[in-house]
Regions:
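A cross-kingdom feature marking charged/low-complexity
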Residues: 1-3, 59-73
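Short aromatic-glycine-(Arg/Gly/Cys) micro-motifs in beta-strand/loop hairpins
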Residues: 2-26
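Histidine-centered active-site/metal-ligand motif
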Residues: 8, 30, 54
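Surface loops and adjacent helix of pleckstrin homology
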Residues: 23, 32, 56, 65
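A sequence-level detector of short linear motifs
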Residues: 28-29, 62
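A short, polar/proline- and glycine-enriched secondary-structure boundary/capping micro-motif
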Residues: 29-32, 72-73
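A short, charged, amphipathic alpha-helix used as a generic interaction element across diverse proteins
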Residues: 31-47
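A short amphipathic beta-strand at an alpha->beta junction
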Residues: 47-58
Length: 73
């Protein structure tokens, strides 16, 4: 059975960038949190998992469930 890993947006501690992570691995880097969230939302929708957005301090800012929205705009 395939494990479903949520998609996380978090600050990169080594650079002034935002990264999108899934399953403990970085899948993309972005200059703004907004662009990272847009990319993460697409990835979460495709994988039917939750999107968790963290602030620069590491705390969770928002949590979106995209499990049932794979085919929506």
């Amino acid at each position: 059975m395939r494990r479903h890993h949520d998609v996380h947006v978090c600050a990169d501690p080594h650079a002034y960038l935002w990264r999108v992570r899934r399953g403990g691995r970085t899948i993309s880097h972005h200059r703004t949190q907004r662009n990272a969230v847009l990319a993460a939302r697409r990835a979460a929708r495709r994988s039917r998992v939750d999107l968790v957005t963290h602030g620069r301090d590491g705390r969770i800012r928002s949590n979106e469930s995209l499990r049932d929205q794979a085919n929506q705009g």
